[in-house]
Amino acid sequence: MTLPGPEAPGLSEALALIADVPDFPQPGILFKDITPLLAEHAALEAVVAALAAPGRDQTGAPVVDKVLGMESRGFILGAPVALALGVGFVPVRKAGKLPRATYAVSYALEYGEATLEVHQDALEPGDRVLLVDDVLATGGTARATIDLVEKCGASVHAVAILMELGFLPGREALGTVPLTTLLTV
């Protein structure tokens, strides 16, 4: 069986829909806008299939129990990946956004600190999860999410990212966790 992955048919066309927006949100920044990709059904389907691939074995069966998406664009991509895999979706939110008891992990930002949270009952001990997000930059959010999953007694099977900023050290922050990126810029 051929599984969709980073070389899946239609994926290169889908990734070509990502628009460059110069000087946004500030001068000197080249923003990568994924909204044109999201607006095209076939493109979104190709990206979801490729992001789901690390959550499957060679027969196509899911090898994860949950998909976690990091706030906020990880929600947009993670929920359909969970549907494609036939597993549940768990949102990882910024501090104070979840209404029930949570686990929390704080991590350093360039100028300060941020905290991520997940509901305490969102993962079971022993669950294997696939982390999904739109961008891997410094790796702080992904690393904090890995730590949060481990705090729940679960493990991260793999990380699936739409775009990796290759000029930043995000990959190194993941340690030995397998990483799939669909586009490196």
UniProtKB/Swiss-Prot annotation:
Q: Which UniProt keywords apply?
A: Cytoplasm, Glycosyltransferase, Purine salvage, Transferase
Q: Which EC class is this protein assigned?
A: transferase
Pathway field: Purine metabolism; AMP biosynthesis via salvage pathway; AMP from adenine: step 1/1
The terms under GO molecular function for this entry are: adenine binding; adenine phosphoribosyltransferase activity; AMP binding
Q: What is its main location?
A: cytoplasm
PROSITE patterns reported for this sequence: PUR_PYR_PR_TRANSFER
**Matching Pfam families, A to Z?**
Pribosyltran
Keyword Membrane present in the record's keywords: the answer is no
Enzyme Commission designation: 2.4.2.7
Query: GO cellular component annotations, sorted alphabetically?
Result: cytoplasm
- Single GO biological process annotation from the record: AMP salvage
Instruction: State where the protein is found.
Output: Cytoplasm
Quickly give the catalysed reaction: AMP + diphosphate = 5-phospho-alpha-D-ribose 1-diphosphate + adenine
Q: How does it assemble?
A: Homodimer.
Function recorded in the entry? Catalyzes a salvage reaction resulting in the formation of AMP, that is energically less costly than de novo synthesis.
Per the record, the similarity remark reads: Belongs to the purine/pyrimidine phosphoribosyltransferase family.
Protein name per Swiss-Prot or TrEMBL: Adenine phosphoribosyltransferase
Question: What organism, scientifically named, is this protein from?
Answer: Nocardioides sp. (strain ATCC BAA-499 / JS614)
